[in-house]
């Protein structure tokens, strides 16, 4: 069979070495084995073309920072399996760039040729029976003028006298020399790490929190959560898969990743199982080596600082593993992180662990797991294991010191009131006192919460310093907004309150109550009025809840707590000559026969809140079937908790907007 000597000229997606490269661009799905065959020439129905690892697309701008070396990973792929070994030779090709400029009316200048080199002489082989060559590294050494944009083009040719296509296509990379980016800026002995769910959130938000004393970033490491490990059903090869949101971030690395790195924040990417057989704990040695090389291509091309592994959601087949897989074991996971260390150099390797088999242990080639990884974090949060996992590093891992372990992961999303649920300073004091070196945070919701109050509380324990917020917050796609920070004075005024839920009693045609049902979000009948109390430290709050005719006459007292409003059960009126009834605020929820039953035994609980970046206030309590309302007492007993005339009860949670 004839194989086209595809001279698909091309600048292939290049990689960044270490932390010093700026790259944007990847294919929409960022899957290495996906190509665009629409542009390809064929010879006898078989074609070959140059591709970049990590799915990087043509005309990707690559930034070379300081004296760092950028590294690209190129390979050659045929549309059908080779019948015999095919040798492919890549070369940097200025003629291709000139032709591209002429055809497209551009004037790209070639990057200095003496700063470019191809590993292994630019030679790679497609073995008989396979379609892809091994990858060849394209090294871009520092050179050129800072601020100027250059280009590089690469072409390829094949041996064995195969016919050359006359309709070549080119791949071109833009290269931008830039000043060096700073190394990590340490603020203390404890590294702060944050997993960001990029399906919804923007990692740039993590760079807006800084230490009060010197302006250093609060977060040391930000992890893109998450790309996936999957198996190609056709080839059986394990590869990286990125969904649209991760792909968008990688394609726009200069917009989302580089600004954090410029502040000294390391940006890593989490690899997560994805409901097929591919996992961290079942790769053969050969498969582990191959996958490690692919991960390195992602690090190089997108300028990432490391990889975190999270071995969840893999469908392990221990009874009959497919070729290339073995039975799941911690030893196999250890082999993977070992092979990653061999090719990653000083790049970060982290592990998110919460069970037993989902983490590496033991030693590989005489090297213990604790000496391979840079950090591990326990995976159960404050609502799942309030006491953390202190001491787990000794009982579960070979040679893992406390300095590399996070025993108290802290979830800071809306599920846990922005991180305030279960908050206890003494827990973080224990992290510090016992010599642990990692504090992990998970799933921030920066469009819902201002985190500087929470982070200050934690930072004052860990670092004896507070945290400031810039006031800026970012949408997922990169729109910047200016937020508003609220102090004690800012809560004074009129607020419109909207509940996330409400319940009403369905009444039949004969007037008989049948059942409670959801009525959805509702506004309070009257706006809430907040005034300062006499001491100037708390508030007097009017019109709260379902009965403003009572709470408007007898207001609550509330505290200023964690930057927001704290609401708690209390007596709002003691019976007197004018009104002998006593009114108390209790938590209550629905019951039968029009009852909204009070629970005085819950009087030790409270509702507290957090401030959104736009100045809205979110209030949370016992749950969305509960509310805090006034109950009338006569003779020391609740007179009634049956309210047939109330169309619905406004229940938690609440959003308050300043009028």
Regions found by a protein language model. Give the residues of each.
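Secreted glycan hydrolases and related glycan-binding modules that recognize and/or cleave
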Residues: 27-86, 92-115, 121, 125-487, ...
């Amino acid at each position: 069979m004839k194989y086209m000597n595809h001279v698909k000229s091309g600048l292939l997606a290049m990689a960044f070495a270490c932390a010093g490269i700026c790259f944007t661009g990847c294919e929409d799905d960022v899957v290495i084995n996906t190509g665009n065959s629409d542009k390809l020439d064929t010879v006898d129905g078989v074609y070959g073309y140059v591709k970049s690892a990590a799915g990087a697309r043509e005309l990707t701008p690559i930034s070379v920072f300081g004296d760092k070396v950028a590294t690209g990973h190129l390979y050659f792929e045929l549309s059908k399996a080779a019948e015999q070994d095919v040798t492919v030779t890549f070369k940097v090709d200025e003629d291709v760039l000139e032709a591209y400029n002429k055809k497209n009316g551009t004037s790209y200048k070639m990057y200095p040729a003496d700063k470019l080199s191809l590993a292994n002489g630019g030679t790679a082989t497609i073995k008989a029976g396979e379609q892809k060559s091994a990858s060849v590294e394209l090294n871009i050494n520092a050179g050129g003028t800072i601020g100027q944009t250059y280009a590089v083009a690469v072409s390829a040719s094949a041996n064995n006298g195969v016919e050359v296509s006359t309709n070549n296509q080119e791949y071109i990379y833009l290269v931008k020399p830039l000043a060096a980016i700073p190394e990590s800026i340490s603020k203390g002995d404890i590294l702060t790490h944050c997993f960001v769910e990029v399906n919804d959130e923007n990692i740039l938000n993590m760079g807006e929190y800084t230490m009060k004393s010197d302006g250093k970033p609060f977060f040391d490491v930000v992890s893109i959560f998450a790309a996936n490990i999957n198996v190609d059903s056709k080839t059986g090869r394990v590869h990286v898969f990125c969904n649209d949101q991760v792909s968008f971030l990688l394609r726009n690395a200069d917009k989302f990743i580089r600004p954090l790195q410029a502040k000294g924040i390391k940006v890593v990417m989490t690899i997560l199982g994805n409901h097929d057989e591919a996992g961290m704990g079942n790769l053969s040695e050969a498969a582990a080596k191959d996958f490690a090389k692919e991960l390195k291509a992602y690090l190089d091309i997108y300028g990432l600082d490391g990889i975190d592994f999270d071995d969840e959601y893999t469908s392990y087949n221990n009874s009959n593993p497919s070729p290339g897989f073995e039975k799941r074991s911690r030893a196999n996971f250890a082999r993977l992180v070992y092979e990653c260390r061999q090719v990653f150099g000083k790049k970060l390797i982290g592990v998110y662990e919460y069970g037993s088999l989902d983490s590496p242990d033991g030693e590989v080639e005489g090297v213990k797991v604790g000496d391979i990884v840079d950090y591990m974090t326990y995976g159960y949060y404050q609502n799942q294991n309030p006491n953390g996992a202190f001491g787990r590093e000794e009982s579960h891992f070979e040679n893992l010191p406390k300095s590399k372990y996070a025993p108290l992961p802290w979830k800071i999303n809306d599920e846990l009131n922005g991180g305030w649920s279960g908050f206890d300073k003494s827990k973080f004091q224990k992290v510090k006192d016992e010599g642990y070196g990692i504090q992990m945070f998970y799933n921030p919701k920066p469009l819902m919460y201002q985190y500087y109050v929470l982070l200050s509380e934690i930072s004052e324990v860990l670092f004896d310093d507070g945290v400031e917020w810039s006031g800026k917050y970012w949408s997922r796609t990169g729109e910047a907004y200016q937020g508003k920070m609220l102090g004690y004075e800012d809560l004074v005024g009129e607020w419109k309150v909207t509940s996330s839920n409400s319940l009403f009693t369905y009444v039949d045609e004969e007037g008989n109550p049948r059942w409670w049902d959801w009525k959805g979000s509702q506004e309070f009948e009257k706006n809430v009025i907040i005034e300062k109390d006499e001491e100037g430290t708390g508030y007097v709050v009017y019109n709260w809840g379902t009965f403003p005719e009572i709470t408007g006459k007898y207001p609550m007292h509330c505290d200023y707590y964690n930057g927001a409003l704290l609401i708690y059960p209390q007596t709002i009126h003691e019976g007197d000559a004018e009104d002998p009834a006593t009114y108390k605020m209790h938590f209550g929820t629905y019951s039968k026969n029009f009852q909204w039953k009070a629970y005085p035994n819950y009087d030790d609980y409270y509702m507290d809140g957090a401030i959104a970046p736009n100045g809205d206030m979110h209030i949370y309590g016992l749950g969305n079937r509960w509310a805090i309302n006034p109950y009338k007492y006569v003779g020391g007993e609740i007179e009634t908790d049956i309210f047939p005339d109330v169309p619905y009860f406004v229940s938690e949670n609440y959003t308050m907007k300043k009028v």
